C-alpha cells in the first residue's frame, strides 16, 4: 500500500524525473488479481497526475519506445504499465503450458517441467547456461557503448569540478556520509520546556547550519514541533524545490520510506516526525532502515499518556518497548541496529540531538514529550548522556535504592525521591536515555552506575 502515498506525492510534486514500471500480469501468489481487486490502475495514477503508458510488456521494442516517450514528459512522473504473461514460455511436466499460473509465482521449475521449459525457449537442457552468440555479441557491443558514456560522464564531472571547486568540495563532503559540523553551543534551552519544544530549538539551528538536511512531517509539524525547522526554510512544492521540508500528509509509512530512499541515495540527512503512537504505522520502514544501516532520524513526540484530549488512541504504551527491542538487536556488523534516545529534559534533548547527528551508521529514534518537564537538578553533567545512562546530580552517596528512568519519568523520580528522603531513605537517580548505549559501555562503568546486587527500581 506504499504505492498509494508515493504515487500521490510524486504526482502532486510533478516529479518528471521519475519513471515507474508496473508489471501487470494479473497473477499473484495465491490467486488471480481479479479475485481481490477490480480497480483501474491506469485511471488511479492519472488521477494522481501521472502520465500513463500501457504497452505489451513482453515486447522489447515497445518498452524502448515507451521509455523514450517517458523521458520527454515534463511536469509529471510516468507510469509504464507492461501487460505481461506470468511464466512466459514455461511448460509443465506433461509439456502443457505453465503460463498465467499462480504456481509459477514463487516456486522453481523442476524435473521434466524444467527440461520442457528450456526446450520451449530454444535452449539445450544438457547445457542450460549456454550464452547464445547473438546475446554475447549484443552485450559486448553494449559494454563498449557504456565505456564511452561513462568516460564522457567522468570528463564532464571533472570539468565541472574544476570550474566549481567550492561546490565540488561540498558535494564530496555530503556524499562522504560524515557527520556535519554543528555549533551546539549556540543552542539555549528554556528551563522546564517540553522536550518536543526543546527539539524545535535544535531543529532551528540545524536548518541554518546543515544545508543538506531534509525534514518531513506527517501533517503534524505544529504538534511534533518540526516547525522549528520549517520556519527557517520552506516546504517543497511542484515548482520550487529550494526548500528543505517535505509535507507528507497523513502517510507515516510513505514518509518514512521517502526518508529511507533519500538515505540510500546519499548526500542528504533525512529526518521525519509524527506522534510516537503512530510509529506503529512505520514499523516496516523502521525495520528496513535498521537492516540496511541507514542513518535516518525518526522524531516521535507525545511520548506518554499525557497527550491531551485525544485519549487512549494517542497514548503510546507498548511502543517504547518495541522500539527499544530493535536497539538491542544486532545488525550484520554486530552493532546495535538502532540508537534510541528519550531525553529527560530540555538540556538532555540537545545532547540527544547531538548524538543523533553524529550517528552515521544506524537509524536513530528521538522520543520527546508533549508536556513541560522540570529540569534536572543544578550541576547535572548532561555530557554523560552520551554513555546511555548516568547518575543525576544531587543523588545520595551509598544509596539504599537506585531509581532508573528515561524521559519525563526522570523528573517524576526526582519528586518521589524528595518524599523518600524525608523518611531517611538514600536515593540515587539514574537517567537512562539510551539502554543500548549504556549496555555498550564497559562492565566497570555499568557497575558504577547500577552496582550488581543493588536495589533497583525502574
Where are these regions (language model features)?
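Short glycine/serine/threonine-rich phosphate/pyrophosphate-binding segments
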Residues: 1-5, 253-257, 280-283, 410-414
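Thiamine diphosphate
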Residues: 3-130, 136-367, 372-374, 442, 447-449, ...
